[in-house]
């Protein structure tokens, strides 16, 4: 974690290992009147962080490299998700599209593309056969490796069940891991109406991908049927799934990319997500006076959750709000999340100011190292999910654990203390 004294307070981040020297005053902020009455941005006028050492001149500071993040859409579904992210204005990320279908690649908005398996498929696609998709990726393995050079974090997105996405995504992940990238898979499981064959292929693809990524988030498309209106057109339903993919990527990348008074290091995120296995993703939106409670509750309890995040050992959560976002609201949201995760969880936290969210708050929670129990956390309140896209919706998406983990036990991230200023009501100091 690094201090940035020259940048505006549009992103605040804390890690479970505690804060930098000079932050002891944050505990007192929660009991002071400024918390309830002042927006979070105003607190920048109250210095609570240590200045750089006077013995080190500014021109002697070695600039750090910004973490390089890429999103790679594999197959038709993955490329559609990439198009959605680009259209939504996600910044600070390089987008790539990978497909066997040359015609589909001509319609992508991604600035960089790889047509895999040109000799094998002649640009005509995989015909819904994952074996063809896998062989195509193997044929173009060197090209995939070149596209990942110098990359720190890779998101691999695909629609499971088809040919290219199902077969090629695990190979892309394998190459990324070999090159030392933190590799996160965010994929969809098909709707039931897409047929048993596609569902079976999807499960096989998910199992193959699970063993090749650090963290895997699976979006069960079929559960969208329980929260979207019955009259929702088919195209809109798929768009909703694509937008959930986008929010998952952005919830993690914003913490790393957007500069602020205190920046969360890429190493902090890696500590939670490296070799974490399956993950649950929750996204909640709240508005009005109780927006913090509403957003946090929606993020951890939704009709889309297949299992509970109870006892999660690793958590990345991002709070986004307008310039009226207060420190008190951040604390309220954090306490709700801390109620359901492990007391010694390694927690990475970030707060982002977005002028478009005046009067609203959006929370993204990524939980890893959980027990995967089917019982959902009992929320004190709930909000009706609206899946029309941010910032007016609530979307919560889990991934599932495979029946038999090919890698055996999932190694947990190192356990770190929860920040004192957020956990003093919940957990005593050690």
Curated annotation (Swiss-Prot):
Coiled coil: none
Compartment(s): Cytoplasm
Gene Ontology molecular function: any one: GTPase activity
GO biological process: cell division; cytokinetic process; division septum assembly; FtsZ-dependent cytokinesis; protein polymerization
Listed GO CC annotations: cell division site; cytoplasm
Highest taxon above the source species: Bacteria
Keywords recorded for this protein, A-Z: Cell cycle, Cell division, Cytoplasm, GTP-binding, Nucleotide-binding, Septation
Positions of the UniProt region annotated as Disordered: 374-418
Function noted in UniProt: Essential cell division protein that forms a contractile ring structure (Z ring) at the future cell division site. The regulation of the ring assembly controls the timing and the location of cell division. One of the functions of the FtsZ ring is to recruit other cell division proteins to the septum to produce a new cell wall between the dividing cells. Binds GTP and shows GTPase activity.
Family membership: Belongs to the FtsZ family.
PANTHER family noted in UniProt: CELL DIVISION PROTEIN FTSZ-RELATED (PTHR30314), MITOCHONDRIAL DIVISION PROTEIN FSZA (PTHR30314:SF3)
NCBIfam families xrefs: ftsZ
Entry protein name: Cell division protein FtsZ
Organism whose genome encodes this protein: Synechocystis sp. (strain ATCC 27184 / PCC 6803 / Kazusa)
Lineage: Bacteria, Bacillati, Cyanobacteriota, Cyanophyceae, Synechococcales
